[in-house]
A protein has these predicted regions:
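Short glycine-rich anion-binding loops that position phosphate/pyrophosphate groups of nucleotides
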Residues: 63-64, 85
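Short Gly/Thr/Asp-enriched flexible loops that form oxyanion-binding sites at enzyme active sites
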Residues: 66-76
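Residue-level marker for well-ordered alpha-helical positions
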Residues: 44, 65-66
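Active-site-facing substrate-recognition patch
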Residues: 1-53
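Short alpha-helix boundary/capping motifs
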Residues: 40, 61-62
Protein backbone atom coordinates (compact mmCIF):
# COMPACT_ATOMS: atom_id res chain seq x y z
CA UNK A 1 0.00 0.00 0.00
CA UNK A 2 1.36 3.43 -0.83
CA UNK A 3 2.16 5.80 2.03
CA UNK A 4 -0.39 8.31 0.74
CA UNK A 5 -3.18 5.73 0.62
CA UNK A 6 -2.22 4.36 4.05
CA UNK A 7 -2.32 7.87 5.58
CA UNK A 8 -5.71 8.56 4.01
CA UNK A 9 -7.14 5.41 5.61
CA UNK A 10 -5.46 6.02 8.98
CA UNK A 11 -6.78 9.59 9.10
CA UNK A 12 -10.36 9.00 7.93
CA UNK A 13 -13.32 9.62 10.22
CA UNK A 14 -15.05 6.73 11.98
CA UNK A 15 -18.74 6.86 12.95
CA UNK A 16 -20.83 4.39 14.92
CA UNK A 17 -23.79 2.90 13.07
CA UNK A 18 -25.52 0.78 15.67
CA UNK A 19 -22.76 -1.40 17.11
CA UNK A 20 -20.63 -1.12 13.97
CA UNK A 21 -17.67 1.22 13.52
CA UNK A 22 -17.95 2.53 9.96
CA UNK A 23 -15.05 4.41 8.43
CA UNK A 24 -15.79 7.32 6.10
CA UNK A 25 -13.28 7.42 3.25
CA UNK A 26 -13.40 9.28 -0.07
CA UNK A 27 -12.86 6.14 -2.16
CA UNK A 28 -15.70 4.32 -0.42
CA UNK A 29 -18.12 7.15 0.25
CA UNK A 30 -17.11 10.17 -1.83
CA UNK A 31 -16.91 12.14 1.43
CA UNK A 32 -14.83 14.20 1.66
CA UNK A 33 -14.13 14.72 -2.03
CA UNK A 34 -12.10 12.10 -3.86
CA UNK A 35 -8.47 13.07 -4.47
CA UNK A 36 -7.51 12.20 -8.07
CA UNK A 37 -4.09 11.07 -6.79
CA UNK A 38 -5.77 8.39 -4.63
CA UNK A 39 -7.76 7.16 -7.64
CA UNK A 40 -4.52 6.99 -9.60
CA UNK A 41 -2.78 5.04 -6.83
CA UNK A 42 -5.62 2.57 -6.30
CA UNK A 43 -6.21 1.96 -10.00
CA UNK A 44 -2.47 1.36 -10.53
CA UNK A 45 -2.45 -1.10 -7.61
CA UNK A 46 -5.45 -2.95 -9.04
CA UNK A 47 -3.88 -3.08 -12.50
CA UNK A 48 -0.75 -4.63 -10.95
CA UNK A 49 -2.62 -7.56 -9.39
CA UNK A 50 -5.78 -8.06 -11.49
CA UNK A 51 -6.25 -9.60 -14.90
CA UNK A 52 -8.26 -7.20 -17.03
CA UNK A 53 -8.60 -9.52 -20.01
CA UNK A 54 -12.25 -8.55 -20.36
CA UNK A 55 -14.66 -6.70 -22.60
CA UNK A 56 -16.34 -4.66 -19.85
CA UNK A 57 -15.47 -3.58 -16.31
CA UNK A 58 -18.48 -4.12 -14.01
CA UNK A 59 -18.93 -2.17 -10.78
CA UNK A 60 -21.56 -1.80 -8.09
CA UNK A 61 -23.67 1.34 -8.01
CA UNK A 62 -22.21 4.33 -6.23
CA UNK A 63 -19.08 3.26 -4.37
CA UNK A 64 -17.33 1.52 -7.26
CA UNK A 65 -17.97 4.14 -9.95
CA UNK A 66 -14.90 6.37 -9.34
CA UNK A 67 -12.49 3.42 -9.40
CA UNK A 68 -14.18 1.83 -12.43
CA UNK A 69 -13.93 5.16 -14.24
CA UNK A 70 -10.20 5.45 -13.50
CA UNK A 71 -9.59 1.88 -14.65
CA UNK A 72 -11.69 2.38 -17.77
CA UNK A 73 -9.73 5.49 -18.75
CA UNK A 74 -6.35 3.82 -18.18
CA UNK A 75 -7.20 0.50 -19.82
CA UNK A 76 -9.47 1.71 -22.61
CA UNK A 77 -12.13 -0.77 -21.49
CA UNK A 78 -15.75 0.41 -21.12
CA UNK A 79 -17.50 -0.03 -17.78
CA UNK A 80 -21.05 -0.61 -16.68
CA UNK A 81 -22.78 -0.12 -13.35
CA UNK A 82 -24.88 -2.70 -11.53
CA UNK A 83 -27.81 -0.71 -10.15
CA UNK A 84 -30.42 -1.39 -7.50
CA UNK A 85 -33.21 0.16 -9.54
CA UNK A 86 -34.59 -1.44 -12.68
CA UNK A 87 -34.91 0.81 -15.76
CA UNK A 88 -36.61 -1.68 -18.15
CA UNK A 89 -34.07 -0.91 -20.87
CA UNK A 90 -33.50 -3.23 -23.84
CA UNK A 91 -30.90 -5.85 -22.90
CA UNK A 92 -31.16 -5.08 -19.19
CA UNK A 93 -30.69 -8.15 -17.00
CA UNK A 94 -32.73 -8.38 -13.80
CA UNK A 95 -30.99 -10.17 -10.92
CA UNK A 96 -32.52 -10.54 -7.46
CA UNK A 97 -30.56 -11.32 -4.32
CA UNK A 98 -32.09 -11.66 -0.89
CA UNK A 99 -29.99 -11.62 2.26
CA UNK A 100 -30.52 -11.65 5.93
Amino acid sequence: MSDELRRSVENCDVVMIGDYEYFIHPLADGIPSVDPKLLDIVSDMMMAVCDFDCDVIVTAEAMGIPIATALSLKLGIPFTVIRKRKYDLPGEVDIAQYTG
